[in-house]
Amino acid sequence: MEGRGGSRGGAMARGGGRGGFGGGRGGFGGGDRGGRGGGRGGFGGGDRGGRGGFGGGRGGRGGFGGGDRGGRGGARGGRGGARGGKPAAGGKPGAKVIVEKHPRHEGVFIVRGKEESLATLNSVPGESVYGEKRVSVGEGEDKKEYRIWNPFRSKIAAGLHRGVDEIHIKPGSKVLYIGAASGTTISHVSDIVGPTGVVYGIELSHRPGRDLIGMAKKRTNVIPIIEDARHPQKYRMLIGMVDVVFADVAQPNQAQIVAQNSAYFLKNEGHFIISIKASCIDSTAPTEVVVQNEITKLKKEKLRPQHLLKTLDPYERNHSLVIGVYRKFGSSEK
């Protein structure tokens, strides 16, 4: 079904071209492959990205420790496309789009028009957080507004574009987000978890912390906490048990930070997602060695990696994404 519109985003990175949904999917240790093409990389430098379609080719699935390359490419459109309507504020009249539910990630949508993008249903219609484009569909009481999720501004969105299978964040989820910054990604997580979920955002720096607090004033399911994530005991009375811990702190002791916060707040069999920037941990060692060392540290803390996305290129340079499960009462894996 068709809709119209899409407001013009003012805060996109300069030179931030479009990466595709053709990213391959590898198992733990498998080689993920990016999309095809030559879109320029934004935010973070001059990587050249891939411009792929949503219907990327299928490849073999790599298992934990396997070396198979490939995997399924971009997401295929599912049922439940949104109805057509008027353009969002600032949108171009006549720009037809189709909004569909993502087939694998609940609470995430695919917007198809001149460009193909991921989006979340805006829980604060009429408001953008970081200048992102917005698309409105439907009429009257059926009108809905979607916010385009920019993969050059969000590690989770980059992972979704690269074909990650599961982020474990869905409507009703309780999420602890370590390294919240000004709230760009948290705002989309807020959209996904909805009114029955909650997002706790930990940020140490006061300047982005002010932006985070300002965003949270309009999103009642976001709880900003301006504190040092290395000392979770300082905010233990503010946070309940959570389903997912996400960490994007780029610190040498990142694995320890995740382990400490998981011990306090992550429920047994809950999940974690860690964005690893190898150069921030050890700039002298090869990226693969640094990532494997971090994985070893996580295993010793009962954090069992299940999926490794070796690269987030072209969206984020020198970043990997590790997703796994917390076995609180199991023995540590050496």
Curated annotation (Swiss-Prot):
One cellular-component annotation, GO: nucleolus
Comp. bias (Gly residues): 1-93
GO biological process, one term: sno(s)RNA metabolic process
SUPFAM superfamilies: S-adenosyl-L-methionine-dependent methyltransferases (SSF53335)
Record's subunit section: Component of box C/D small nucleolar ribonucleoprotein (snoRNP) particles. It is associated with the U3, U8 and U13 small nuclear RNAs. Part of the small subunit (SSU) processome, composed of more than 70 proteins and the RNA chaperone small nucleolar RNA (snoRNA) U3.
Catalyzed chemical reaction(s): L-glutaminyl-[histone H2A] + S-adenosyl-L-methionine = N(5)-methyl-L-glutaminyl-[histone H2A] + S-adenosyl-L-homocysteine + H(+)
Gene assigned in the entry: fbl
Organism: Dictyostelium discoideum (Social amoeba)
Coiled coil: none
SMART domains: Fibrillarin
Modification after translation (UniProt): By homology to other fibrillarins, some or all of the N-terminal domain arginines are modified to asymmetric dimethylarginine (DMA).
Protein localization: Nucleus, Nucleolus
Protein name per the record: rRNA 2'-O-methyltransferase fibrillarin
Keywords in alphabetical order: Methylation, Methyltransferase, Nucleus, Ribonucleoprotein, RNA-binding, rRNA processing, S-adenosyl-L-methionine, Transferase
Family: Belongs to the methyltransferase superfamily. Fibrillarin family.
EC number: 2.1.1.-
General function of this protein: S-adenosyl-L-methionine-dependent methyltransferase that has the ability to methylate both RNAs and proteins. Involved in pre-rRNA processing. Utilizes the methyl donor S-adenosyl-L-methionine to catalyze the site-specific 2'-hydroxyl methylation of ribose moieties in pre-ribosomal RNA. Site specificity is provided by a guide RNA that base pairs with the substrate. Methylation occurs at a characteristic distance from the sequence involved in base pairing with the guide RNA.
An annotated Gene Ontology molecular function: rRNA methyltransferase activity
Entries under Pfam families matching the protein: Fibrillarin
Positions of the UniProt region annotated as Disordered: 1-94
Binding site for S-adenosyl-L-methionine: 184-185, 203-204, 228-229, 248-251
Class of enzymatic activity (EC top level): transferase
